[in-house]
Amino acid sequence: MKDNLLNKYKAKKTALVKDYDTSQAVNSFTLNGKLAWLDKATRVGLVNSLQIEKSANRDTTTLWLNGEQYILNIDLVLQMLVVLELYAKECYNVTEQHLNNIANETDLNRVYNYNYTKGYPERPAFNV
């Protein structure tokens, strides 16, 4: 019975971790004070596009976030994408550590009280 309850709490807490991992609390940055996010595929695609623009001797690019247009220096956007990729990687590591901690926990109260929001890096903030 106790193991059944422990597994139930673990499943619930695991779902909460996964929901938190995909929320704006984790998947966001600010640009000029406005929340935004670029998923992995978009970040990779942007790096490719920016390299092509750079090869064509362009200095600036147009970036659209949440319906707002930003005309930015290509090198600046590439630097921003590096920061975002490192942030996303660190968030991934924190999430995986939380999932591992929950999976390996044997105490019901510790699972119930587990704080899955701790340990995440500070959201990147860019002002351009």
Which ranges hold each PLM region?
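A preference for well-ordered globular domain cores
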Residues: 1-128
